[in-house]
Amino acid sequence: MERLAEAPAPAPLDHAPILLAEDDKNDIFLMGRAFDRAGIPNPLFVVHNGKEAVDYLSGAGDYANREKFPLPGLVLMDLKMPWMDGFDVLAWLRDQRQFDTLPVVVLTSSKLQSDIDKSRELGAYDYRVKPQRFDDLVRLLDDVRQCWLDERFNRFWMLTSDSSAAPPRQMPA
């Protein structure tokens, strides 16, 4: 696939939008409630399949207006979606230089080691299995947000690594 032009800089990470790529309406509803319960201040944008995720990230079609659909600071992505699955989106992202440091966290019901391995091979920063209990989902989302969008974490990363490398997969102690 063809590379896109340089993307505009995203918002400061602690308030950066989060893009959720999820096809299940019940999971979308629960995620929205869990975001509210966790007190996550980041705006949440939802796409319903992998093709919409690519369109959103590339600013194509309905997502061309960057004021209305700003670049996210974090992507939460299901694997099993119609039109284009999470693996296809990860492969597309790997070819898009401007998204080299965009954290993508796979959030799926699959516990298969092959899915975990393939996600990591394709560049996922993290892999989380959707919990069964709502309170566990709240904790998981808060943990993911703190790990990938917390300014303290990102300052640590910027000071301790070269800028071409992806941040580490775990929050420093």
Regions inferred by a protein language model and the residue ranges of each:
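Receiver (REC) domain active-site loop signature in two-component systems and cognate sites
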Residues: 79-81
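Conserved phosphotransfer active-site motifs of two-component signaling proteins
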Residues: 111-114
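Residue-level signal for the "D+5" position in two-component response regulator receiver
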Residues: 46, 83-84
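Short, glycine/charged-rich "phosphate-handling" switch motifs in NTP-dependent
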Residues: 125
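Non-catalytic signal-transmission and effector/linker regions of two-component phosphorelay proteins
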Residues: 1-19, 25-45, 51-54, 58, ...
